[in-house]
Amino acid sequence: MTSVVVVGTQWGDEGKGKITDFLSADAEVIARYQGGDNAGHTIVIDGKKFKLHLIPSGIFFPQKISVIGNGVVVNPKSLVKELAYLHDEGVTTDNLRISDRAHVILPYHIQLDQLQEDAKGDNKIGTTIKGIGPAYMDKAARVGIRIADLLDKDIFAERLRINLAEKNRLFEKMYDSTPLDFDAIFEEYYAYGQEIKQYVTDTSVILNDALDAGKRVLFEGAQGVMLDIDQGTYPFVTSSNPVAGGVTIGSGVGPSKINKVVGVCKAYTSRVGDGPFPTELFDEVGERIREVGHEYGTTTGRPRRVGWFDSVVMRHSRRVSGITNLSLNSIDVLSGLDTVKICVAYDLDRKRIDYYPASLEQLKRCKPIYEELPGWQEDITGVRSLDELPENARNYVRRVGELVGVRISTFSVGPGREQTNILESVWASI
């Protein structure tokens, strides 16, 4: 029984897809356990970029099983589009499995997402308008439609009719918006269900059988710990649990079967959307990091907010997600800076704190306390070991590990597979 969970430790976009792809080489099953197509991950294979939003990164290994777990909310339209994209690129999807217990995103979820966000005005959350939140709302309210329901024509029609009638009343009475047509949605989405039914199964059985047989299973999280609905910067969060604990709920695998948790972070910090960001940069250094790091959302295309590495955030993520190993990405983006900074604590009302406050009002008053380190000018994109890094870059990597309190297993100096350097094999240490 061998399993590893990959989680983002910041606000998403840390390079989880790249690390999952890297670790997938030694895994036999790769599974997603939460989120939806609001998450974007980019994988570079032989210099070619592949952008996925829903299907696990392991799909590029045809001999390995890729699982969309029950904790994922699935937009069938997006899924069918993504499958077609992969087929056009010559990628087989015969190894994909989708949980029959996963909930379905339908057009009324997306419309409600947009209307709710518009109604918030200046207090908007910064949602991707993918219908994720409303789909999880229906799940919690016990009125959601699952993949198993989507495949049953009569059940789907019955539940869609009830849900749509309720949502249309909401659209018309509360938001003065146009109602949606039952027949159009039913025909389109039932057809999508028929297109994906070959992949649908009880994925909890597949995952547990694999673990019981001694196979290596890799669990892939979406977003990041700081977007977790319980542990993140609420309410500027996603609607699910990206923390490692979300694996057990979102995959149907018990906590006793989780061995390692790899936290993925960048050598700096980025964030899409609104919400607290203590180390955010508004100067030319921030703009340089954004441009060099290509910090634009995979899903939205929006410019990401960027800032210095925040070890307070990272220690919070380590604690609430039980991180055992760290993967440090995008060190190369900091090349060329005379000085690099790491936030080691916050100043809250002239008192030094090293925890991440739950209160948004307190966070607004938090000022980062920085430790400055000398930068490096060298191009490090061709580095293939820690010893090859310039001394200042090497010291930066070591200091990050010390401040977070977790050993660094891999570090990356670019987006390619070959630019990921191993310091310690996660699989071998289990």
From Swiss-Prot:
<feature type="binding site" description="in other chain">
    <location>
        <position position="223"/>
    </location>
    <ligand>
        <name>IMP</name>
    </ligand>
</feature>
<feature type="binding site" description="in other chain">
    <location>
        <position position="302"/>
    </location>
    <ligand>
        <name>IMP</name>
    </ligand>
</feature>
<dbReference type="GO" id="GO:0005525">
    <property type="term" value="F:GTP binding"/>
</dbReference>
<feature type="binding site">
    <location>
        <begin position="40"/>
        <end position="42"/>
    </location>
    <ligand>
        <name>GTP</name>
    </ligand>
</feature>
<protein>
    <recommendedName>
        <fullName>Adenylosuccinate synthetase</fullName>
        <ecNumber>6.3.4.4</ecNumber>
    </recommendedName>
</protein>
<feature type="binding site" description="in other chain">
    <location>
        <position position="238"/>
    </location>
    <ligand>
        <name>IMP</name>
    </ligand>
</feature>
<feature type="binding site">
    <location>
        <begin position="330"/>
        <end position="332"/>
    </location>
    <ligand>
        <name>GTP</name>
    </ligand>
</feature>
<feature type="active site" description="Proton acceptor">
    <location>
        <position position="13"/>
    </location>
</feature>
<comment type="pathway">
    <text>Purine metabolism; AMP biosynthesis via de novo pathway; AMP from IMP: step 1/2.</text>
</comment>
<keyword id="KW-0436">Ligase</keyword>
<comment type="subunit">
    <text>Homodimer.</text>
</comment>
<feature type="binding site">
    <location>
        <begin position="298"/>
        <end position="304"/>
    </location>
    <ligand>
        <name>substrate</name>
    </ligand>
</feature>
<keyword id="KW-0460">Magnesium</keyword>
<dbReference type="GO" id="GO:0046040">
    <property type="term" value="P:IMP metabolic process"/>
</dbReference>
<keyword id="KW-0342">GTP-binding</keyword>
<comment type="function">
    <text>Plays an important role in the de novo pathway of purine nucleotide biosynthesis. Catalyzes the first committed step in the biosynthesis of AMP from IMP.</text>
</comment>
<feature type="binding site">
    <location>
        <begin position="412"/>
        <end position="414"/>
    </location>
    <ligand>
        <name>GTP</name>
    </ligand>
</feature>
<feature type="binding site">
    <location>
        <position position="142"/>
    </location>
    <ligand>
        <name>IMP</name>
    </ligand>
</feature>
<keyword id="KW-0479">Metal-binding</keyword>
<dbReference type="InterPro" id="IPR042110">
    <property type="entry name" value="Adenylosuccinate_synth_dom2"/>
</dbReference>
<keyword id="KW-0658">Purine biosynthesis</keyword>
<keyword id="KW-0547">Nucleotide-binding</keyword>
<dbReference type="GO" id="GO:0005737">
    <property type="term" value="C:cytoplasm"/>
</dbReference>
<feature type="binding site">
    <location>
        <position position="40"/>
    </location>
    <ligand>
        <name>Mg(2+)</name>
    </ligand>
</feature>
<feature type="binding site">
    <location>
        <begin position="12"/>
        <end position="18"/>
    </location>
    <ligand>
        <name>GTP</name>
    </ligand>
</feature>
<dbReference type="InterPro" id="IPR042109">
    <property type="entry name" value="Adenylosuccinate_synth_dom1"/>
</dbReference>
<dbReference type="GO" id="GO:0004019">
    <property type="term" value="F:adenylosuccinate synthase activity"/>
</dbReference>
<dbReference type="InterPro" id="IPR018220">
    <property type="entry name" value="Adenylosuccin_syn_GTP-bd"/>
</dbReference>
<dbReference type="InterPro" id="IPR001114">
    <property type="entry name" value="Adenylosuccinate_synthetase"/>
</dbReference>
<keyword id="KW-0963">Cytoplasm</keyword>
<feature type="binding site" description="in other chain">
    <location>
        <position position="128"/>
    </location>
    <ligand>
        <name>IMP</name>
    </ligand>
</feature>
<feature type="binding site">
    <location>
        <position position="304"/>
    </location>
    <ligand>
        <name>GTP</name>
    </ligand>
</feature>
<feature type="active site" description="Proton donor">
    <location>
        <position position="41"/>
    </location>
</feature>
<comment type="similarity">
    <text>Belongs to the adenylosuccinate synthetase family.</text>
</comment>
<dbReference type="GO" id="GO:0044208">
    <property type="term" value="P:'de novo' AMP biosynthetic process"/>
</dbReference>
<dbReference type="InterPro" id="IPR033128">
    <property type="entry name" value="Adenylosuccin_syn_Lys_AS"/>
</dbReference>
<dbReference type="InterPro" id="IPR042111">
    <property type="entry name" value="Adenylosuccinate_synth_dom3"/>
</dbReference>
<dbReference type="GO" id="GO:0000287">
    <property type="term" value="F:magnesium ion binding"/>
</dbReference>
<dbReference type="InterPro" id="IPR027417">
    <property type="entry name" value="P-loop_NTPase"/>
</dbReference>
<feature type="binding site" description="in other chain">
    <location>
        <begin position="13"/>
        <end position="16"/>
    </location>
    <ligand>
        <name>IMP</name>
    </ligand>
</feature>
<feature type="binding site">
    <location>
        <position position="13"/>
    </location>
    <ligand>
        <name>Mg(2+)</name>
    </ligand>
</feature>
<feature type="binding site" description="in other chain">
    <location>
        <begin position="38"/>
        <end position="41"/>
    </location>
    <ligand>
        <name>IMP</name>
    </ligand>
</feature>
